[in-house]
């Protein structure tokens, strides 16, 4: 199976990349590195079934080339910093809304079998206790 993982150099995205690369799937990791880190995926760069694409989900032309032969998309690309969203609301809108629309449109255009769109912990509000554990209310 050929997978596209947007935001693949982030914390969760890099874990997904590693999981599927080690299972033998072809993985394309797309990240703009605004919050993701090359350190998170450096150990995957030598795998033949792993491809890193430095780019942005706002770039329709790039997505057109990348999504073309993909079976499955994990969309984890987002501007995730709440404080930054107040300072740069247009950037947040462009990435989180317009970028996601681009991913969905390419998935439709190329008849991608499945897409999983991730949210963030911010939808749950502020944590009552830090650090958060598995039993957190």
What is each residue range found by the language model?
Residues 1-137:
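N-terminal Rossmann-like NAD(P)+-binding domain of SDR-like oxidoreductases, especially those catalyzing
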């Amino acid at each position: 199976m050929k997978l596209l993982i947007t935001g693949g150099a982030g914390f969760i995205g890099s874990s997904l990349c590693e999981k599927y690369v080690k299972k033998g799937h072809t993985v394309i990791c797309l990240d703009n590195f605004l919050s993701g880190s090359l350190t998170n995926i450096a150990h995957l760069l030598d795998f033949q079934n792993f491809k890193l694409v430095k780019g942005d989900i706002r770039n329709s032309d790039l997505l057109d080339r990348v999504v073309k032969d993909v079976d499955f998309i994990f969309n984890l690309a987002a501007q995730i910093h709440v404080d930054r969203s107040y300072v740069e609301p247009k950037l947040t809108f462009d990435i989180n809304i317009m970028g996601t629309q681009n991913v969905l449109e390419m998935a439709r255009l190329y008849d991608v079998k499945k897409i999983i769109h991730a949210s963030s912990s911010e939808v749950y509000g502020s944590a009552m206790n830090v650090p958060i554990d598995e039993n957190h209310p």
